[in-house]
């Protein structure tokens, strides 16, 4: 696989070519994903739940994300690698710069930050300092205590309109990717059409430019339950490599996510 850059993703959006993304946490799986031509990987703070067994992502530290980023980069030298900025690691602009630097030095090509238009100045600051940013909207797991659980976001008109505004504000501030989690497909379509940067969805229908799944969900090995928006590709194929290829192709063809994986 050739080295993937944000410019490739921008070109794919312009060409209407959909792309797949998955979380990764170690060199072995990162290598497997790269061998199957997975273009984008995310070292997610989801590791707190799927690796550490925590009930949410809040305990994850920047040092832990940096460690797993180094592991993933070792296994996948050519993917576009995003790394999550954990809870409160970007509470101030100064903290954001210091912690983003650690993740970029660990091998990330981009950091992912949760938050609406209030985070625009931080994104602008990072972009000006050569740190590409993916802005995460919708269900932002670090806000689980505000939301009262993992709930669908943007179902009423006021919140939907605010999310569109957030996406455009963050793109203007310098975000190079927008990630939408657990939002109605109609809202995801509005945002995907409104933004010039690539939009990645998880639980956001099949109209976004890209899709992302947690690795453990894609292989059906999550400890607790299978989210509505996920699919066990390993059960369908019986082989991990074939499962990865099937996921990539289904995303590219717009077959996944299907109606049963989508919120209205």
Swiss-Prot record:
Record-listed 3-methyl-2-oxobutanoate binding positions: 45-46, 84, 112
Compartment(s) where it occurs, according to its Swiss-Prot or TrEMBL record: Cytoplasm
Gene3D superfamilies: Phosphoenolpyruvate-binding domains (3.20.20.60)
Coiled-coil regions listed in the entry: none
An example molecular function term from Gene Ontology annotations: magnesium ion binding
The record's free-text note on cofactor binding: Binds 1 Mg(2+) ion per subunit.
Ligand binding (Mg(2+)): 45, 84, 114
Any one GO BP annotation for this protein: pantothenate biosynthetic process
Superkingdom as given in the UniProt entry: Bacteria
Catalytic activity reported: 3-methyl-2-oxobutanoate + (6R)-5,10-methylene-5,6,7,8-tetrahydrofolate + H2O = 2-dehydropantoate + (6S)-5,6,7,8-tetrahydrofolate
Active-site residues from the entry: 181 (proton acceptor)
CC annotations in GO: cytoplasm
Cofactor(s) annotated in UniProt: Mg(2+)
PANTHER family membership: 3-METHYL-2-OXOBUTANOATE HYDROXYMETHYLTRANSFERASE (PTHR20881:SF0)
NCBIfam families: panB, PRK00311.1
Family: Belongs to the PanB family.
Subunit structure: Homodecamer; pentamer of dimers.
Purpose of the protein: Catalyzes the reversible reaction in which hydroxymethyl group from 5,10-methylenetetrahydrofolate is transferred onto alpha-ketoisovalerate to form ketopantoate.
Name of this protein: 3-methyl-2-oxobutanoate hydroxymethyltransferase
Protein source organism: Aliivibrio salmonicida (strain LFI1238)
Organism lineage string: Bacteria, Pseudomonadati, Pseudomonadota, Gammaproteobacteria, Vibrionales
Gene label: panB
């Amino acid at each position: 696989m050739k080295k993937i850059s944000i410019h490739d993703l921008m070109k794919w959006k312009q060409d209407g070519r959909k792309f797949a993304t998955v979380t990764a946490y170690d060199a072995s799986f990162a290598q497997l994903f790269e061998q199957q031509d997975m273009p984008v990987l995310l070292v997610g703070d989801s590791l707190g739940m799927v690796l550490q067994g925590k009930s949410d992502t809040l305990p994850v530290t920047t040092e832990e994300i940096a460690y797993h980023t180094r592991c993933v980069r070792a296994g996948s030298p050519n993917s576009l690698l995003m790394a999550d900025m954990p809870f409160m690691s970007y509470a101030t602009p100064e903290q954001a710069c210091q912690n983003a630097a650690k993740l970029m030095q660990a091998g990330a090509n981009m950091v992912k930050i949760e938050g609406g238009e209030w985070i625009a100045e931080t994104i602008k600051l990072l972009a000006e300092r050569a740190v590409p940013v993916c802005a995460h909207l919708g269900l932002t797991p670090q806000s689980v205590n505000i939301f009262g659980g993992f709930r669908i976001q943007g179902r009423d008109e006021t919140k939907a309109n605010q999310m569109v505004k957030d996406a455009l504000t963050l793109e203007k501030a310098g975000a190079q990717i927008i990630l939408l989690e657990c939002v109605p497909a109609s809202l995801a379509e509005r945002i995907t059409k409104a933004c010039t940067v690539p939009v990645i969805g998880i639980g956001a229908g099949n109209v976004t430019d890209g899709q992302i799944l947690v690795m453990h969900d894609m292989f059906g090995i999550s400890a607790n339950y299978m989210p509505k928006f996920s699919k066990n590709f390993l059960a369908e194929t019986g082989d991990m490599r074939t499962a990865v290829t099937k996921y990539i192709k289904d995303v590219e063809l717009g077959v996944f996510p299907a109606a049963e994986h989508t919120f209205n």
